[in-house]
Amino acid sequence: MRLTQGCFSFLPDLTDEQIEKQVNYAISKGWAMNVEWTDDPHPRNNYWELWGLPLFDIKDPASVMFELQEARKACAAGYIRMNAFDASYGTESCVMSFIVNRPANEPGFYLERAEGKGRQINYTIKSYSVQANPEGGRY
């Protein structure tokens, strides 16, 4: 099952050229870029691991692409995403986020159902990869 989080997630994987164009766009808007990775793809997992430091004053897309290539070398078997942060007054938030690397096999999720008080049914989404493997060995 293909993980769909962030911009472009329903499109085919972006090429490096397309990623660089998005980075160029973000830099032209004055947004700071950063690279994050995870091996826990749960839809509610918003706290991915930060790769290196945020690239605040970078004006050259090649520097961002270099960091992406380094992250791919170290975390090739997991998910890697790029974020653009708009620090302007009134926004101060992530304005663009997209996945740039995926594991070869994405096993997907399952729905766990549990009965609560008064026959209330509670649902939880769990990842097959997280249930089967410890952190750091999932992909």
Curated annotation (Swiss-Prot):
GO terms for biological process: reductive pentose-phosphate cycle. Transmembrane segments: none annotated. RuBisCO catalyzes two reactions: the carboxylation of D-ribulose 1,5-bisphosphate, the primary event in carbon dioxide fixation, as well as the oxidative fragmentation of the pentose substrate in the photorespiration process. Both reactions occur simultaneously and in competition at the same active site. Although the small subunit is not catalytic it is essential for maximal activity. The basic functional RuBisCO is composed of a large chain homodimer in a 'head-to-tail' conformation. In form I RuBisCO this homodimer is arranged in a barrel-like tetramer with the small subunits forming a tetrameric 'cap' on each end of the 'barrel'. Belongs to the RuBisCO small chain family. It is found in: Plastid, Chloroplast. One of its GO terms (cellular component) is chloroplast. This is Ribulose bisphosphate carboxylase small subunit. The keyword NAD does not apply. Heterohexadecamer of 8 large and 8 small subunits. InterPro entries: RuBisCO_ssu, RuBisCO_ssu_dom, RuBisCO_ssu_sf. Pfam families: RuBisCO_small (PF00101). Keywords: Calvin cycle, Carbon dioxide fixation, Chloroplast, Photorespiration, Photosynthesis, Plastid. It comes from the Eukaryota. Its main location: plastid.
